Amino acid sequence: MTSEQALLVLGIETTCDETAAAVVERRADGSGRLLSNIVRSQTDEHAPFGGVVPEIAARAHVDVLDGIIAAAMNEAGVAFASLSGVAAAAGPGLIGGVIVGLTTAKAIALVHGTPLIAVNHLEAHALTPRLTDSVEFPYCLFLASGGHTQIVAVLGVGNYVRLGTTVDDAIGEAFDKIAKMLGLPYPGGPQVERAAEAGDPNRFAFPRPMLGRQDANFSLSGLKTAVRNEAGKLTPLDPQDINDLCAGFQAAVLESVADRLGAGLRLFKERFGPPKALVAAGGAAANQAIRRMLREVAAKVQTTLIVPPPALCTDNGAMIAWAGAERLALGLTDTMDTAPRARWLLDANATAPAKFANTRAGF
């Protein structure tokens, strides 16, 4: 299989609380075309618990995945026999869901004699902008997906160098925890963003974590604690209190992330030269305030900003299919004994930053 061939790939995503399948075409020139993208969210199943329950998530994937795949194939107008490959997210993620998706992909591949591609969920986010915008390597990636917040130099398919990472909470986690703390509905991230629009970001003097450091790492646990402390002083909270707390929290996150991205882009330029673009991927990139901040950061360093459409920032099958197609074009396929993985580094040689060896920063 070579990059001179057009490739049709089915992608399956089940790492968390979205059941998704999609079909993409990778043309001979390396450009992409999305033929279908079906996503079924489990929000209603998890809302009563205020967060994702792994057992419920896995069972929901089992219940609906076959139908989601059938819908994706039907919308694309593609038969299984026409596929060049079938890709599934093999991690990182909730292991029950990962098993469901990967096992289903193996069955399809086995029955139809189709190559299997086991995709790293984070790599799929990292490569999505090449589907939507045909961006060339190397580019600087701001990845904010689930429990991950990282700045990564994307040098090629399978070639990633981490420039910065969170040493505690990821951005998405912090938004969700603040929402739960303030009694906002699940999923919390969009609720905090919505409340912040009606709030005063200057009412509370929240800290701006890691500001001015030479490294490009993130930390949000102290900010989260500061919000909790201020909320505790105001009990019971009225709606405007909640709006102002969310606005202050989001403003602090934006300033901190902008500073950390500035450091990351400087490190990128020192090691690899100017990036072809600043790229954002992952669910947090769907936040409109974060998108505005990213535009300002990109303008400041005079680089192009690429952010996929919101539907391709959150978890979806298209990104898995595309990553599978990119790998397949290089002849990278997997065997039937490929194991699902709850943890899977995007950059295999990464080590925790100095002084943070005992934190999650190495993951």
From Swiss-Prot:
The organism of origin for this protein: Rhodopseudomonas palustris (strain ATCC BAA-98 / CGA009)
Alphabetized GO MF terms: iron ion binding; N(6)-L-threonylcarbamoyladenine synthase activity
GO biological process assignments: tRNA threonylcarbamoyladenosine modification
Cofactor(s), by name: Fe(2+)
CDD domains: ASKHA_NBD_TsaD_bac
PROSITE patterns with a match to the protein in the record: GLYCOPROTEASE (PS01016)
Record field: catalytic activity: L-threonylcarbamoyladenylate + adenosine(37) in tRNA = N(6)-L-threonylcarbamoyladenosine(37) in tRNA + AMP + H(+)
Function: Required for the formation of a threonylcarbamoyl group on adenosine at position 37 (t(6)A37) in tRNAs that read codons beginning with adenine. Is involved in the transfer of the threonylcarbamoyl moiety of threonylcarbamoyl-AMP (TC-AMP) to the N6 group of A37, together with TsaE and TsaB. TsaD likely plays a direct catalytic role in this reaction.
Enzyme Commission number(s) of this protein: 2.3.1.234
Entry-linked InterPro entries: ATPase_NBD, Gcp-like_dom, KAE1/TsaD, Peptidase_M22_CS, TsaD
Localization: Cytoplasm
Entry-linked SUPFAM superfamilies: Actin-like ATPase domain
Name of the protein this chain belongs to: tRNA N6-adenosine threonylcarbamoyltransferase
Positions annotated to bind substrate: L143, A144, S145, G146, G147, D176, G189, N287
Cofactor: record remark: Binds 1 Fe(2+) ion per subunit.
UniProt-listed Pfam families: TsaD (PF00814)
Cellular component terms (Gene Ontology): cytoplasm
Keywords recorded for this protein, A-Z: Acyltransferase, Cytoplasm, Iron, Metal-binding, Transferase, tRNA processing
Similarity comment text for this entry: Belongs to the KAE1 / TsaD family.
